[in-house]
Amino acid sequence: MTAPLLIVDFDGTVCRGDAPVRFYAARIADALPPAAAREFLAATERYLSRGPASAAAAADTVQAAALREALDSWGAVLALAARCYDVPGPVIAEAFAQCRAAMIDPACEVGLVGPLMETLADLRRDVDVVLVTNSPRDSMLPLLDRLGITAAFDDIVAGAAKPDGLRRLLQRRLGPDLRARPWRLCSVGDHYRNDIEPAAEIGAAAAYIDRFGRADGPATARARRVEDLLPVLRAWAADPEGTTRLAALAGRDGPG
């Protein structure tokens, strides 16, 4: 019998902290005129501080929409650059590549969430733990090596093209009856559309790290920090079919 499957996101889940996002934004700002660069970086900082609520202080309605609609800080930087400052796609992509390269350097502050990693180590006795990230494999694997967590997962799927890439992965791993037996899956992450929706839509357990209290859609449990969701992950791994009890363990509302 195939083991239950725990899908784990990387940015904002396994690792936390805004230093890499600030580096990404700074590299994009290098391509802007000085005044525009200052405005762009200021808008980025507002999002990092207040999330979608930062739209209230936006300079114009386009910026407000970009901030309000961004599902995470990486998306906010991308949306600001593309929608508000017309930064070309190749420039944005190069800035992201430089950011990922910088994260491999020990000098770059990358905050590994230790309690989560300890929990994953325990859960691997009962479930398959798979890291699924949209970041390219050629930069992700060296970063995992730097952090010493390459062996912490049963499988690593980089360049996953979530959310649809995650949906395809679930079909391959769980088979055609994934909707009939959704209890075999739990997904944890901080990007609702990429990490949570593909699980929630088939009735599987979904643990949403909702940093800014967005409440984007249904989830088994949500909390602002992944540490507050660890009891949910442990309970699911211990009794995957008992997912109806999981929301109470997070101390947050479940579906809704």
Tell me what each language-model feature is:
Residues 32-44, 85-97, 151-152, 178:
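Short, surface-exposed acidic
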